[in-house]
């Protein structure tokens, strides 16, 4: 079987690795670097990728950076006289990685394992897979970045039982995952994150500060000058990296712009203390996902054996200090934060080819999945942090008599109401035979594959007719929406609960009206008009309350109707029981006549009841 390469497709940098024997090895690019900038530029129709593209970013406006942040969206970028999708630009980076991996291996590479942030949604995962396909790669598996890192860290520790926390702060995204390692099984217990937090944000804080300082001194706003802004970005990134090793750095940008008196230069120094002050709020934002992941995993800090740092941004001293303070543990530095994800992806490639034995990877889905049900409620079928691959089915029914079709509205999120979650897709199951509401049995099945990609099937159990949808990338969530979804879920918990209670009450009222009308019809001419009239009066009162929309009135009238309907049902039951008893007495008398000598026997009859 041909080699399966492991690719870490990052926001700012990417890396490629391959399994050689039992060891994962990073493949250096043609310039001798072990990571490659995720930058694409165009010059005279030529596509330039990596270090060369990054070097000319200042002078070449046809340069595209951080394309990963647009994956899963319909947003396009303009360059080279045309518009490109994020998948196409990502494919150019993947092609470059694939090309130099082939040069190193001396053979054609057709398969890859590609990593994504743990908090990437269905659309973003599908977009990543599509980018691989465009690049000529068969994507064997999409693996979460923290999980891949744990795989690289834990491969030689499969005989130990450990719980590890992976803190992954990359160029554009932040993830925390809790894993349990033991007997070769890598089991993801929980994952949390912030898809709008990464090294780019730290750079931006420095850029904003430099722009502000220059404006104070010279009265010129550099943020409106594209070329100056790119130079500031490069300088901010370099200063950030310098401050991981020194306590102060010099920023020198000659001829940054021109004023009335001639050229102007930017000369300043940035201390680590000032950098920490500028980025304090970003470091604070890393704490909530750590606590969330621990809570979801049902673990306390004392139960965590190791803390692994992943991503270049974890080299920032303030970030390391925050991790120590939050976890009470010294982070494990045995893995290279820039390379460990690609190495883990290559190991997963080895698991697929059979070169790595006795290793099982159990990943999770980051957000709940479900459908919209009556009243706009979001009914979850698969909860977040469920181990994948997984499949879950639930039977639903129609909401109206003789309903010929049902709309299946597929959603992803954590809010109780469908409108507050993100639509993944919609489809229809048609040709349902005419039947009263509640009779047709519609089975909805959610299936998440090993890559976290969702397909949904609806099946009429009566006719066996079914309809399936595989969620396409243009219908997925954006990073911001996922982040907002989780925050909104916490902030709006009380309001959500109230709205759900209202919908539940309305559904209950609707059901009570339907069943009572049916009972009144069934009891016509059966001799208990008093109870029927009382139930009808209570039913009319409830219908009026339903029309008014007054929830308190609906609740009171519903209780009254339930009481009257129960009395009517009891009469019906008593009548049926009396008829049955009379019939049994008749049969008993006949039996006694035919065999008067038999005096024994029991009055208790054993019966089987089938629950429907």
Curated annotation (Swiss-Prot):
Phosphothreonine modification, residue list: 173
Keyword Membrane appears in the UniProt entry: no
Protein induction: By heat shock.
Domain of life: Bacteria
Keyword Ion transport: no
MF annotations from Gene Ontology: ATP binding; ATP-dependent protein folding chaperone; unfolded protein binding
UniProt biased composition (Acidic residues): 603-612
Annotated signal peptide: none
Bias kind Low complexity: ranges: 576-594
Physiological role: Acts as a chaperone.
Family: Belongs to the heat shock protein 70 family.
Protein name: Chaperone protein DnaK
Source organism (scientific name): Streptococcus mutans serotype c (strain ATCC 700610 / UA159)
Gene expressing this chain: dnaK
